[in-house]
Design a protein with these regions (language model features):
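Alpha-helical coiled-coil
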Residues: 9-39, 71-81
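EAAAR-patterned alpha-helical heptad-repeat segments
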Residues: 27-71
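Extracytoplasmic/periplasmic sensory segments of membrane signal-transduction proteins
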Residues: 93-203, 257
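Amphipathic coiled-coil signal-relay and dimerization helices
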Residues: 124, 133, 171-177, 275-286, ...
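Solvent-exposed, extracytoplasmic
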Residues: 145-156, 242-290, 299
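Extracytoplasmic/periplasmic ligand-binding sensor regions of membrane-associated signaling proteins
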Residues: 159, 169, 175-247, 308
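Conserved beta-strands of PAS-like sensory domains
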Residues: 218-260, 315-317, 327-338
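Extracellular/periplasmic juxtamembrane segments that couple receptor/chemosensory ectodomains to their
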Residues: 293-338
Length: 338
């Protein structure tokens, strides 16, 4: 609709300009005819005196028509120009707000998705099979059973790449995948960020959300959620190990950025992005620059908004969080070429 208003304003401007030029040309032609008539009436002497009066009147009418045309053109031209400019501004504002709304929708989907991940890991860390596998003196069969239990969970929750269970020393005792990281059991993860963060959680309500990264062991991009497994499964129990849930970030995030509702024409000229707090590209609809490129958003301290830069319109939105998940300071952003 705003684009149609702009087109109409531009068309009115063109038609008005052409019409004013036509009127001015008619006035000039009429003026010339009047002058020629005066010349001929002068040659005719007294017999042309009456015709001379008519010729002068026609000349005056032509002058008035030309003056009116110039006045009308002078009045309309700046107003049509202003209307066109206002239309362009309206189009830019509507387009920008739409992009900002779509950016917010995208980051809200991410938030709701990751909120569920934070709930999953805390719940599974209290599973009896997981707790029993880390109990002092637990037999090897307990760890094997925990692995099978994690496998059952993994088959139902297909958004995860794997689930790893490590003891208090950082040794992986069980994991759920039968196709990935087959050498995970027995490996040392004590130096990995997810394990250290999990062991530092305060109680069973606490969890750690790690930055998106390329996980060497799993051969994929993950967003890891972790928490401590506590003695006896009690909320305030002593940490006896850690559970790490490796979310399939690349596939899930790509589904989100490619699923933003754009028209075919918009999709050709628009890049949908998920960015971390430092502007690092976490996902991109064109799959370019992921975990390498940084985009500097001009937010002016606002949680959402729009602006134009370098021939593009940018709409952005900061993560609002969801329920007990506060978000990680990430942004949704759409960059549309003009």
């Amino acid at each position: 609709m705003p684009e149609r208003v702009v087109r109409l304003a531009e068309e009115v401007g063109q038609v008005t300009g052409q019409t004013m030029q036509g009127i001015e040309q008619v006035a000039k032609s009429t003026k010339m005819l009047a002058l020629n008539a005066l010349i001929e009436s002068a040659r005719a002497g007294e017999r042309g005196a009456g015709f001379a009066v008519v010729a002068r009147e026609v000349s005056e009418v032509a002058d008035r028509a030309r003056t009116l045309s110039e006045d009308l053109s002078g009045e309309l031209r700046p107003r049509i120009a202003e209307l066109t400019e206002l239309g362009h501004q309206l189009v830019a504002r509507v387009r920008g707000q739409r992009l900002a709304d779509l950016a917010l929708n995208a980051i809200e989907i991410v938030d709701r998705n990751l909120y569920e991940r934070s709930c999953d890991v805390r719940w599974w860390a209290t599973d009896a099979a997981v707790v029993d596998a880390l109990a002092p003196g637990a037999p090897a069969a307990a760890a094997a059973f925990a692995g099978r239990r994690l496998g059952v969970i993994l088959r139902s929750y297909t958004v995860y790449l794997d689930l790893w269970l490590a003891d208090a020393h950082g040794r992986v005792v069980a994991h759920g995948s039968s196709t990935r990281a087959r050498d995970a059991v027995g490996s040392d993860v004590s130096g990995q960020a997810w394990f250290r963060a999990a062991m530092a959680t305060r109680d069973s309500d606490d969890y750690a959300a790690l930055d998106v990264e390329q996980h060497a062991g799993l051969g994929a991009t993950t967003a890891t959620y972790a928490t401590a497994v506590r003695e006896g499964g009690r909320a305030d129990g002593r940490p006896v190990g850690a559970l790490g849930a490796f979310f399939d970030w690349e596939h899930q995030a790509q589904t989100i950025v490619e699923g933003v509702r754009l028209t075919p024409a918009e999709r050709e000229s628009t890049r949908v992005l998920l960015l971390d707090r430092d502007g690092l590209v976490l996902a991109a609809s064109d799959r370019v620059g992921v975990l390498h490129e940084r985009v500097a958003l001009c937010t002016d301290g606002q949680p959402s908004g729009t602006y134009t830069a370098d021939g593009t319109t940018v709409g952005f939105a900061l993560t609002p969080g969801y329920e007990t998940y506060p978000g990680l300071g990430w942004y949704g952003a759409l960059v549309q070429r003009h």
